[in-house]
Amino acid sequence: LEREQLDLFQALPGVVAPRDAQDLMAYPFFSLAKTRRIAPIDFRAGDVAIRVEAMPDHGMATIWDADILIWAASQIVSARDAGLRTSRLMAATPYEMLTFIGRGVSKRDYLRLKAALDRLQSTSVVTSIRQPAEGRRHRFSWINEWQERSGRNGRPLGLELILPDWFYRAVMDDALILTIDRAYFGLTGGLERWLYRLVRKHGGRQRAGWRFDISHLHRKSGSLSPLKRFAFELRDIVRRQPLPGYLLFTEVEAGGRVLLAFEPAPAPVDSVVPSGTRTIVPSGTASSCFREPPSALRHGPETGNRAPNLESNSQSNSLAGKPRTGGGEQKRRCIGRREGAGT
């Protein structure tokens, strides 16, 4: 049995930094809906092929279920960095797992955790990613098996699970792991969760930002929503600006093509700087010196497009290529929490 050949890795106590696997951030491996999904995901881009299949009894593993894999990756990387031995066979309490991913610890939350483990185990993935030869495929489930542990007196001791070798190898490779913002676990929408992971994956490589064709994003997400609905939901995310650490924009090219762009958010600063007096000091204008300065994000048209994203993963970017000539006009909008700032 596989279990007998593996050493047990007990989850580390205390707080560890959340880490995510870049392959899972860049490609459509999970359902973005909270409703049960049975329809498979089929994705191809260059030499990358992915097929995700669900069992009718449980449905496809969701992007919320993937939080368990983020927990596992975080534990393994932290232990490895501390010089401890790790293993694909992991043990932890439901409390440790649930609190790490920002969930409650009620009986209902525990039952949801077990349902998530069932979906992760029953979802089947076939992919060409990180295969040594062209045309080869690797099939696995996100969890090979899991079980509840109990003592001799029947007292529950926690959970054990076995990770697939494909995922474990990615986690053990520093080049394939990124630290993510803990605020990610507070994102409630499936699309915004997927978008944060995609943006975080590319944001670490190009500090000047990134831009995507909306239809390309639609294909890349694996979403079952029609393109029109998908674009509407993206615009709503741009309006709300929920992604920790990043600002989102829509850009409209001269030909009418709509792009989604992002940039790293500026470092937070104090919104009010005391003047050392009890009263508001006039600034020479109708407003006070406490007024928020005009935003650097312009709502009006800009000329010229950004430089193409050539230095990063071309398979994840449908816009890579030679720069456009002629300097066509490009309109840029950022609709966020401070809509109308500086107007």
What are these regions (language model features)?
Residues 1-342:
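Charged, alpha-helix-forming regions
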